[in-house]
Amino acid sequence: MRYLVLTRIHTANIQTSAYFDSINKIPDMILTAHKLGMAGLALTDHECLSGHVKWLLAEKELKEDRKIPQDFKCACGNEIYLVENRNNIEKYWHYILIAKNSDGHRAL
C-alpha cells in the first residue's frame, strides 16, 4: 500500500527589512519552520524582493551547519496587489507569487 505524505510550506511570510512590517528574522523563521516539522518555507515580502539574497544565504549556511536538512526548501516569492483603477485605489486584492525555479525568480 502506498501512502501520500503531505507536507506543509507556508507561503505568506515577511521579514524585518520589509517596510518594517514584521519582526521576523530570517534565520529564526527558517529554524522555527523546521522545528515545527515543515518541509520548507517561502519568503513573500510585500512587493519587495530585497530579502531574497539574505534568505538564500541563510538557507545555505543553515544547511552547511546541519541545522536544517538538505531537503528543506526555502522558496522565494512576492506578495503583489492588483487594483481595478490605478487612480482610485479603494480596494485591492493580494496575490502570492512563488518562483518555481531560477527562471521564475527572474520573472518576479
Where are these regions (language model features)?
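Phosphodiester-processing cores and adjacent nucleic acid-binding clamps
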Residues: 1-108
